[in-house]
């Protein structure tokens, strides 16, 4: 699920956490970035 990483992955305010990117990749996406403390899959 595209939004499942939002709750699971904590983010810093700027840039992305590796945790977010890994979660998104496991979900089948290319990766993820963090915006406003939330993980977004891309």
From Swiss-Prot:
How is expression of this protein distributed across tissues?
Expressed by the venom gland.
Q: What is its main location?
A: secreted
Give start-end ranges for the coiled-coil region(s): none
Keywords of the record: Disulfide bond, Ion channel impairing toxin, Knottin, Neurotoxin, Potassium channel impairing toxin, Secreted, Toxin, Voltage-gated potassium channel impairing toxin
InterPro entries referenced in this protein's UniProt entry, alphabetically: Ergtoxin, Scorpion_toxin-like_sf
The similarity annotation says: Belongs to the ergtoxin family. Gamma-KTx 1 subfamily.
UniProt remark on domains: The presence of a 'disulfide through disulfide knot' structurally defines this protein as a knottin.
Question: Know the name of this protein?
Answer: Potassium channel toxin gamma-KTx 1.7
Originating organism: Centruroides elegans
């Amino acid at each position: 699920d595209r939004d499942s990483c939002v709750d699971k992955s904590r983010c810093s305010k700027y840039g992305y956490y590796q945790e977010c990117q890994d979660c998104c990749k496991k979900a089948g996406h290319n990766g993820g970035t963090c915006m406003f403390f939330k993980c977004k899959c891309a």
